[in-house]
A protein has these predicted regions:
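Conserved beta-ketoacyl condensing-enzyme motif
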Residues: 7, 28-170, 199-208, 303-319
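Glycine-/small-residue-rich "gating" segment that lines the acyl/pantetheine channel
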Residues: 132-139, 177-180, 184, 193, ...
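Active-site-proximal alpha-helical scaffold in enzymes
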Residues: 85-95, 148, 156-200, 238-260, ...
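ACP-dependent fatty acid/polyketide chain-elongation machinery
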Residues: 1-74, 253-265, 360-374, 419-421
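Conserved small-residue
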Residues: 9, 27, 89, 111, ...
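Active-site pocket-shaping loop/turn-to-helix segments
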Residues: 15-22, 69-90, 138-147, 165-180, ...
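Condensing-enzyme catalytic core mediating Claisen C-C bond formation in acyl metabolism
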Residues: 4-8, 35-36, 46, 222-299, ...
Length: 421
């Protein structure tokens, strides 16, 4: 019998702060990481709010301090999404106590960190420099800063990890697909340990304006904390977030052999394509349902064995409806008895980093038997009254298996099942 694949380390940078402990505690207590944008002047942009990672000055307890991640000279070469990935990787590797020094261990450690957009702000800044100051003023680090695979590359370089290196660039499913890719590499015997997850940082004027042109973003301004409202009748779009979620995964046998503590089991994974539309999934959610069914088959679980669902739930009208259709397609009548959380209500949508961060939230639910609340769910959308949304406050709940979903543009779907040790 194959040894199960387990999580031995976790690290997060999110709008709820830096570090798994701070982010989890704030999520459970109903803290919102969504606020007015102060990083730049939003001018006449109708989008004024985002899930920004707090800086150390505004959040001394859990703010992001780039000086702790890299010295000033090194930071010139790094886009923000890479800095977030490095910070989250350090936390995860420390918890896992995995700092390989032998050639064999370094070659047996994969680094798979997804990103939907990569260093998009660097591209817009470079274009501005080119237009106003000429090509001679462009930084030689422009290209290596913005390439999406450089989050994975920088983690690999820093820790000398010489195993497989990869970066799913699959929009909002990238983080979950990175985890799935790492699971496959371990199961196929290509690597013993994998550093997996996602990183994203694209809160800038062009990104916001472009997503707004698609009518995808919330335009709430008066009460930023209420802007992300998954499954609520009044939802008006997603809130852009940023951050990174990184996990260390390996087989249980490998973890026990080196004295590591397993935190949770990655018991099932599935991915699929809608083959339908570049930005919208089919109304019946058939592609997403297929990813969930594949994950259930891998985990050898019946649908009613799932105790909790961490929904993708971005707070768009079309997306939330399609996900519920997919869940009904997958779980049938059992869905009414499964509590559902939508953590993007607290963080906004971290795009390619969402799967990394939300898989960690899912693992914590399994570990602590605690379900995070869905914020801002005041008026449940039509046709959803039969479902059990965790709202208002966190819930104590016996949790053996959690399903975590991630879907993205292009019709990509991913589903991950995390189980108790």
């Amino acid at each position: 019998m194959q040894s199960p694949i387990v999580i031995t380390g976790m690290g997060t940078v999110s709008p709820l702060g830096c570090g798994v402990k701070a982010g989890w505690e704030r999520l459970l207590t109903g803290h919102s990481g969504i606020s007015l944008i102060t990083r730049f002047d939003t001018g006449d942009l109708p989008v004024k709010v985002a899930g920004s990672v707090p800086g150390i000055d505004e959040d001394p307890a859990a703010g992001f301090d780039p000086n702790r991640v890299a010295v000033a000279k090194e930071r010139r070469k790094l886009e923000l999404f890479s800095l977030y990935a490095l910070a989250a990787a350090e936390e995860a590797l420390t918890q896992a106590n995995w700092y390989p020094t032998s050639d064999a261990d370094r070659q047996a450690t994969a680094t798979i960190v997804g990103s939907g957009i990569g260093g998009f702000p660097t591209i817009t800044q470079a274009q501005n420099t080119l237009s106003t100051r000429g090509h001679r003023r462009l930084s030689p680090f422009t290209v290596p800063a913005f390439l999406a695979n450089l989050a994975a590359g920088n983690v690999s370089i820093r820790y000398g990890l010489r195993g497989p290196l990869g970066c799913p660039v699959t929009a909002c499913a990238a983080g979950l697909q990175a985890i799935g890719d790492g699971m496959r590499l371990i199961r196929n015997g290509e690597t013993d340990v994998a550093i997996v997850g996602g990183a994203e940082a694209c809160i800038d004027p062009l990104s916001l304006a472009s997503f707004h042109a698609m009518k995808a973003l919330s335009t709430e301004q008066e009460d930023p904390a209420s802007a992300s409202r998954p499954f609520d009748r009044a939802r008006d779009g997603f809130v852009m977030g940023e951050g990174a979620g990184i996990l260390v995964i390996e087989t249980l046998a490998h973890a026990e052999a080196r004295g590591a503590t397993p935190l949770a089991i990655l018991s099932g994974y599935g991915t699929s394509a809608d083959a339908h539309h570049i930005t919208a999934g089919p109304e019946d959610g058939r592609g997403a349902a297929e990813a969930m069914r594949t994950a259930l088959r891998m985990a050898r679980l019946a649908p009613d064995a799932i105790n909790h669902i961490n929904a993708h739930a971005t707070s768009t009208q079309v997306g939330d409806r399609a996900e519920i259709a997919a869940l009904r397609n997958t779980f049938g009548d059992a869905l009414a008895g499964i509590p559902i959380s939508a953590t993007k209500s607290a963080t906004g949508h971290l795009l390619g980093a969402a799967g990394g961060v939300e898989s960690i939230f899912s693992a914590l639910s399994v570990m602590h038997n605690r379900l995070p609340p869905t914020q801002n769910l005041k008026d449940v959308d039509q046709g959803l009254d039969d479902l059990d949304f965790v709202s208002g406050a966190a819930r104590d709940y016996p949790t053996q298996h959690v399903l975590c979903n991630g879907f993205g543009f292009g019709g990509v779907n991913a589903a991950l099942i995390i189980s108790k040790i």
